[in-house]
């Protein structure tokens, strides 16, 4: 929550002078928990208000009614955590409805769309949307350059890499380091020796395991481009402490 939800809301509230938010997500625990944290932060820390909140079943493909509500309520920001195939329908229908995410008049911030999802959505249908992630394929650093090159050599030039893919890549390397520190494959010993494990070869940059077994990482905001990639607009100068359920937000 600290790295993806709170950091992105702080940024957009300042950068876009946003005060009103419309929360939309798929109907399961992650979007609901994320939006509970988002609502608390918006109302109690940013001095803003939530003008709408809607959830849709997984696989839902008809968003015309909520798009009409968004038009009517004119929020400064649509905060989206729609997942899976529903993303294809949602963003294509936004585009068809004339809601232009490249304009200053309509801001959409997603915590659930990576380069992988854009393959299905189509870059032209999501251009201008803002995404909050720790990793984007376009990151300009030697670690990522080597990672992208190796990934495409294995999976083809058309393959893309999103935040979740990079996380899956990091997992075994972090586990390997923890096993070596523990000198054992025993689960409890590996858990005990995990906090403090560092990795300076991660495509996203240097990361470190926190006491809660999440990763210290930089938060990043990027803008979706028509070619399916993201242009990074902002990243925190320092690693952010990971906290999935910050005190006062439960």
What are these regions (language model features)?
Residues 1-250:
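Extracytosolic ligand-binding ectodomains
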